[in-house]
Amino acid sequence: MKKIAIILAAVLCLAGCGAGDNQWAIGPFTRPSDQPVIAPDTTKVFLCPMRGELVKWQESDTFNPAAAIKDGNICVLFRSEDNSATGIGSRTSRVGYAESEDGIHMTIAPEPVLYPADDDFKALDWPGGCEDPRVAMTEDGLYVMMYTSWNRDTPRLCVATSTDLINWTKHGYAFAEAGDGRYADMACKSGSIVTKLDGDNLTIEKFDGKYLMYWGEDMVNLATSEDLIHWTPMVDEDGELLALIEPREGKFDSALTECGPPAVHTKDGIVLIYNGKSDETHAYCAGQVLFDAKQPTKVLDRLDEPFLVPELDFEKSGQYVAGTVFVEGLVRHEGKWFLYYGCADSFVGVAVSK
């Protein structure tokens, strides 16, 4: 009986770690700490250019982080909410900046680095703010951020660029010029630019002369660009947006399939880590899907089970009590993968894989 139990435990371990047919998946991941790496802070204040007054920009919640490498350190750009109102989506979001040598212990900048301002984009950004960043880097060191502008009317996927992760230039709505303006009022978010792994560096890659970006919340779509600023959604023969993957009934992603961190071109294909929401439990868990690198709209494989689920207290207690591990930041550092995620819309966590 003891021998049977040992064999059964080994089988369950292999299944849980993504062995067998899922060797293409990135991971497995483990949590290096039972505490969040970034949490709300009531001491940090910022002169809001829209309100004309000091606000505690990191007071309420810190979550949904991007990640990048700069000067050998891990940098995390996270969504931070003030306390201007109550309820999910009703505060103002700004993007904060943190830096770490080990990926766990963070030094956080005193002020946000991307936020609503009295600029050409205030109609997109205000009053909801700048949300849910994803960051990827070009081979020549330009950082490209895809983020959601939220004016509390229509969420739009927007672009910003930087050479140092601190000073950002906004470029506006990614699909503004696509399709002769047919997408001008389209609600959209969550852009995952396709990258390649070169040593420990993830850099943006071109495919047949164009950049690729998986995007979407209700379903995963694909867009192309020649300059990383102006993007065009891909459509089918009827002119409708592509639905490369969609929610699956009865699974962890039965309600939503929302793109996570920048996708990674590996020897097996293009791996997209995404966020799945359950229609039954409403929890957010993390999944992975493999696309054909020669035909990036073609799905080769997809995990049936999530590889990261809400387990720790701070992943299940906060604004979103149904539980959330919302993955948005992925970097390679000193031979390890660091995956950063939002926890219950309130904290930032990290998981690590060799």
Regions found by a protein language model. Give the residues of each.
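General helical structural elements
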Residues: 6-7, 83
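Short Gly/charged-rich anion-binding patches and loops
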Residues: 258
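Positively charged n-region of N-terminal signal peptides that target proteins for export
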Residues: 1-4
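Bacterial N-terminal signal peptides
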Residues: 7-15
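Beta-rich carbohydrate-recognition and catalytic domains
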Residues: 17-128, 136-255, 264-320, 334-354
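C-terminal structured domain segments
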Residues: 322-323, 327
